[in-house]
């Protein structure tokens, strides 16, 4: 059995590849830049293939002979300037293209996100579950939520009348050890802030989960869990200043926990290339929570402790940066 992993060089995808290899499972790691395969150890079980979600011929070749697909490919929202072109289209059109060549696939695990569950306009303190959908997103208001929700819908519609096992995994923000310096971007940029960012934090709440739990969930879901189920993976929620205090307590050195007030936060957003007042206004001082139900139990996950996740993530960041 060979498992195709799309987005194999991404943070989640790379950990999925490593988890499969650790179990002696043959992996076909799909990536656009094969030079990034250097992050993986040499192994007779690892086959590296160059393919692109917009190139159907390359996808067809990548899928050929694989009955199991773990679809992790995604675009980093934090670096995108053209949300439609760089985030929405790769997620939706890329998923449609992949579906078009998976005639012989029997099991697919699709990496979604809590972004596909959390509405753009949510109530402060709202608890969301796998029954919720991000149905109010647009490219301008919530491009990432739109991309994740619509890609999942496309995948589910494609699988609806097929004899195929489909499970979608919905992690919150993913923290944990890096496997390559490029993993310091994306979700880990929140913790990167504490390692080399300014001496203040914004009043933002972060829901997070360990990348190792997420990777194991993807692999275990090939066998475990209910077909067509959406599994939310979320461990803990903390305000940024709480994370700073926790790191200071654990690591034996000072990490920033000074919180900016709203006027200063909006000024920072105005000047920061990756922030906007619109995006900040939607999240500043607000939070949601997630009901993971029996996801960790059913998928038999280690359930890493919050302190372990934060410590391992920051130690790894400091090694790579």
Regions found by a protein language model. Give the residues of each.
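Conserved Rossmann-fold NAD(P)-dependent oxidoreductase catalytic core, especially the SDR/UDP-sugar
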Residues: 81-142
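Active-site Tyr-X1-5-Lys
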Residues: 138-166
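N-terminal Rossmann NAD(P)H-binding glycine-rich loop of SDR-like oxidoreductase domains
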Residues: 3-25
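A conserved pocket-lining segment of Rossmann-fold NAD(P)-dependent short-chain dehydrogenase/reductase
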Residues: 80-81, 135-140, 180-181, 187-209, ...
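Glycine/proline-rich active-site loop of Rossmann-fold NAD(P)-dependent oxidoreductases
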Residues: 161-164, 176-188, 221-231
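Conserved C-terminal active-site "lid" loop/helix of NAD(P)H-dependent oxidoreductases
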Residues: 269-302
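NAD(P)H-binding glycine-rich loop region in Rossmannoid oxidoreductase-like domains
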Residues: 34-36, 41-93
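Mid/C-terminal beta-alpha module of Rossmann-like enzyme folds, strongest
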Residues: 217-277, 307-321
């Amino acid at each position: 059995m060979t498992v195709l992993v799309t987005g194999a060089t991404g943070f989640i995808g790379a950990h999925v590849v490593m988890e499969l290899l650790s179990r002696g499972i043959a992996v076909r790691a799909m990536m656009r830049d094969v030079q990034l395969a250097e992050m993986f150890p040499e192994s007779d079980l690892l086959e590296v293939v160059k393919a692109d979600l917009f190139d159907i011929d390359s996808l067809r070749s990548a899928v050929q002979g694989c009955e199991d697909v773990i679809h992790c490919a995604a675009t980093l929202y934090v670096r995108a300037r053209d949300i439609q072109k760089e985030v929405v289209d790769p997620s939706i059109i890329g998923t449609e293209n992949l579906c078009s060549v998976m005639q012989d696939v029997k099991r697919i695990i699709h990496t979604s996100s809590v972004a596909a569950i959390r509405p753009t306009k949510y109530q402060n303190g709202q608890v969301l579950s796998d029954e919720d959908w991000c149905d109010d997103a647009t490219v301008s208001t919530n491009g990432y939520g739109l991309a994740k929700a619509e890609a999942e819908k496309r995948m589910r519609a494609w699988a609806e009348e097929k004899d195929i096992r489909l499970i979608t995994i919905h992690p919150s923000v993913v923290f944990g050890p890096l496997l390559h310096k490029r993993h310091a971007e994306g979700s880990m940029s929140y913790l990167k802030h504490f390692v080399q960012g300014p001496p203040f934090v914004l009043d933002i709440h972060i829901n997070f989960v360990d990348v190792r739990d997420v990777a194991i969930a993807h692999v275990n879901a090939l066998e475990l869990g209910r077909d067509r189920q959406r599994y939310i993976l979320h461990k803990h929620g903390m305000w940024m200043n709480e994370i700073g205090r926790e790191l200071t307590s654990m690591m034996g050195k000072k990490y920033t926990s000074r919180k900016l007030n709203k006027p200063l936060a909006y000024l920072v957003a105005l000047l920061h290339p990756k922030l906007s007042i619109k995006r900040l206004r939607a999240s500043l001082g607000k939070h949601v929570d997630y009901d993971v139900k029996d996801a960790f139990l059913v998928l038999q996950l280690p359930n890493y402790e919050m302190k372990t996740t934060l410590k391992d993530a920051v130690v790894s960041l400091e090694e790579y940066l």
